[in-house]
């Protein structure tokens, strides 16, 4: 863990530079959340952060490099959220409760960062570096989902618990990602609230993981 600005032994100029960069990154995240990727401008970031456009370019080089740094900063923040949401203090007593908890964990990351993730997804579509980093963040969330559910491995009826839990994660991830990217009525006219959607996805994942299916061997 890095030292805080107040306790850091960095020279004052270096410390000021780091704090200025943090202001730029945080202002950029706010701008992306409020107005999305298409409306993002260095001039607006400059105004919000109180740092000149020239100083921003001197620090980051160009807009592409700046957006990559902003994305890295945002993903780091989300990974911290993953860790908090997957806290060992929240271990469920049985598989059903554990699946519900795991699905709610995934939903909370998407719902809590809806506008920012939408901007990141659009940026990732045109920037391979951003896409790879976003994939790594998604896989971190997958790992935490699997750790939660596989803590009750003995209750799983699927012949391959690892595959089953991976598919359950993909179900939740893809449904919530689609909701964030395209809104509640892209693929269907029926509009479902976030809370109801989370409940239904949790029920679907629980049914998939808990119910024995005709003709499927568990050996």
Predicted feature descriptions by range:
Residues 1-19, 184-185, 213-219:
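N-terminal intrinsically disordered/low-complexity leader segments
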Residues 8, 12, 72-98, 117-118:
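Amphipathic alpha-helical linker/stalk segments
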Residues 23, 31-65, 69:
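Helix-turn-helix
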Residues 24-32, 74, 78, 106, ...:
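Short hydrophobic clusters on alpha-helical segments that form packing/core surfaces
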Residues 67-74, 124, 134-137, 141:
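Alpha-helical DNA-contacting segments of helix-turn-helix folds
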Residues 69, 83-112, 165-168, 198:
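Hydrophobic alpha-helical connector segments
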Residues 86-92, 112, 117-118, 123-128, ...:
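Hydrophobic alpha-helical bundle segments that form small-molecule/ligand-binding pockets
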Residues 118, 151-202, 212-219:
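Hydrophobic/aromatic-rich alpha-helical bundle segments in the mid-to-C-terminal region
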């Amino acid at each position: 863990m890095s030292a805080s600005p107040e306790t850091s032994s960095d020279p004052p100029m270096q410390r000021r530079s780091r704090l200025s960069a943090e202001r730029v990154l945080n202002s950029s995240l706010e701008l992306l959340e409020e107005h999305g990727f298409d409306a993002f401008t260095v001039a607006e970031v400059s105004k919000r952060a109180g740092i000149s456009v020239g100083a921003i370019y001197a620090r980051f080089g160009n807009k592409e490099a700046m957006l990559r740094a902003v994305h890295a900063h945002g993903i780091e923040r989300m990974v911290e959220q993953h860790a908090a949401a997957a806290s060992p203090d929240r271990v469920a007593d049985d598989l059903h409760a554990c699946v519900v908890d795991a699905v709610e964990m995934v939903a909370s990351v998407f719902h809590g960062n809806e506008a920012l993730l939408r901007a990141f997804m659009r940026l990732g579509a045109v920037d391979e570096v951003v896409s790879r980093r976003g994939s790594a963040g998604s896989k971190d969330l997958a790992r935490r989902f699997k750790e939660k559910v596989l803590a009750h491995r003995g209750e799983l009826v699927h012949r391959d618990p690892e595959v089953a839990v991976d598919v359950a994660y993909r179900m939740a991830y893809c449904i919530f990602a689609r909701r964030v990217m395209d809104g509640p009525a892209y693929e269907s006219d029926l509009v479902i609230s976030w809370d109801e959607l989370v409940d239904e996805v949790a029920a679907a994942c629980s049914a998939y993981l808990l119910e024995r299916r005709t003709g499927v061997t568990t050996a």
